[in-house]
């Protein structure tokens, strides 16, 4: 008599998200982590770290965190703002991600020029103006008040849930900026953001 085949247990796909910020980005991606890890534990698992480092040091920290996980991460996302950091450091992270990626683990540079608030603003409309990041916050407050969501603050913990209904708009607008910035390095893509690539990867679970 033939023995019954044993069920093959498929491991979930592990993602590590390491952010430069310790408030805004961890709160936004932490909300995504909570939803996905709760609803799809057998398919995909996320871990979010807000470490406070920037550009190259952020990449090195992400690489170290990835090594420390016994499960092994399939994707490591390095989320950072360009702010006023040296252009060579901003662009070097992209190169490091490419150089360090293998068949087992893929590193992604998720930059925003100038800051993640650009990604938030793109939920409400297309914006191509190269303005200083300090001008994003009053614009965000204006947009949020129009939908009855109050004022913007970097330590708000509800931004993902507020913006979720407008996610498709943000992705489309970010892709339009990406097309305009084609061929430019992150430091020259003003404005621009790659957050949409991470969100698109996770969107089937949201």
Task: Label each PLM-derived region with a short phrase.
Residues 1-14, 26, 30-49, 56, ...:
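C-terminal accessory helical subdomains adjacent to catalytic cores in phosphodiester-
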Residues 16-20:
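Short hydrophobic beta-strand that contains or immediately precedes a catalytic carboxylate
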Residues 21-25:
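Short acidic, Gly/Ser-rich segments with clustered Asp/Glu that frequently serve as metal-coordination loops
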């Amino acid at each position: 008599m033939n023995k019954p085949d044993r069920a093959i247990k498929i491991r979930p796909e592990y993602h590590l998200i390491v952010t430069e910020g310790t408030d805004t980005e961890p709160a936004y991606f932490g909300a995504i982590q909570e939803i996905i890890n709760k609803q799809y534990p057998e398919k995909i698992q996320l871990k979010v770290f807000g470490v406070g480092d920037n550009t190259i040091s952020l990449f090195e920290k992400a690489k170290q965190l990835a090594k420390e996980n016994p499960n092994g991460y399939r994707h490591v996302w390095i989320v950072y703002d360009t702010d006023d950091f040296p252009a060579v450091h901003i662009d070097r992270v992209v190169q490091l991600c490419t150089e360090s990626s293998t068949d087992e683990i893929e590193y992604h540079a998720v930059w925003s020029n100038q800051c993640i608030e650009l990604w938030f603003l793109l939920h409400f409309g297309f914006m191509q103006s190269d303005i200083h990041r300090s001008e994003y916050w009053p614009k965000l407050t204006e947009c949020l008040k129009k939908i009855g969501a109050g004022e913007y603050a970097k330590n708000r913990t509800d931004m993902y849930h507020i913006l979720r209904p407008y996610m498709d708009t943000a992705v489309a607008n970010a892709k339009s900026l990406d097309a305009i910035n084609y061929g430019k390095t992150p430091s020259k893509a003003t404005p621009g953001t790659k957050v949409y690539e991470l969100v698109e990867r996770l969107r089937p679970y949201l």
